[in-house]
Amino acid sequence: MPYSVLLMRKLLLVAIVLTTAGLATPWRGSAQTTRVSNSPPIVSAADAPAGTEKLAVQWLRISVPDLGVMLAAVARPSGPGPFPVVVVLHGTHGFAQEYVRWAQDLARGGFLAVAPCWFSGGSESGSHAVTPPIPCPQLPPLKRDAYPEAVQYIDAVVTAARALPGARADRLGIVGHSRGGGETLQYLLAIGNVQAAVLHSTGHGYRPVTRVAEFNVPMLILHGTADGPANGGSVNTQVALARDFEAALRQNQKSVEAHYYEGGGHNTFFTNSTQREDELKTMIAFLRRYLGA
């Protein structure tokens, strides 16, 4: 079955389910018209963006017909492979160099790690915690409620990552920070063909707690107890929402682990080396359990 037809069917099914469920504010983006590419993403080599030349990664262009061109950094472990794959999705502050280094840290843990610029630009909220976004001029910004487009961009990255040389196509996880985590949850419901997900300071604007019975992917929740608007987050990233989601997953006997960092803000991972090291250790151990390495 052609890639575009399969993706359209999956997204249409999710839209039907969400509409008939009668949810009030969550998931309203699902009612938007879905644009589907006529072919799989086209992957080609790219030059290192200005200012990133010293980062020891491979740069790729991931072209998604009708949507734009994503830039992605690929960090590889040493050795011949094949390796399990991890995709790292940035938050609203943009595709900062910190995400490339995050991918490098995961590669040292034994994973073929892909950090894409999956939407361009970046908001001022939380920008103090990271370097300015790496430019992605051939990719538009992502609207606030761009449900279909977000899922399509993530699916294009996942599809491209699975096809990389040395990748284990049957073992792939997603790590999403803030909006990256929130849209990962959307992706899990719409497509769901991954083996693990790390929800990092994740936004719960779509209230995924209302659909916990439909999640079938092992999840790791990493969240600071002080996360909120005062430190780069929002009302949708407050820790109470993460705790409610965890509790609902457990009540539905879903596979979930959670670590809460006392006093940690929305972006403390990027500013506190002690917390960062602990989070990396925790997520690598989790990913190894479900992906191998």
Regions found by a protein language model. Name each.
Residues I62, H93-F95, Q152-F215:
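Primarily recognizes the serine-hydrolase "nucleophile elbow" in alpha/beta-hydrolase
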Residues I62-A73, P82-A163:
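Serine-hydrolase catalytic machinery in alpha/beta-hydrolase-like enzymes
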Residues V88-H93, T202, G224-T225:
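Glycine-rich His-Gly loop
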Residues L89, P116, H200, Y261-G264:
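Alpha/beta-hydrolase
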Residues T225-E257:
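Active-site-adjacent alpha-helix of alpha/beta-hydrolase-fold enzymes
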Residues R250-A293:
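C-terminal catalytic histidine-bearing segment of alpha/beta-hydrolase fold enzymes
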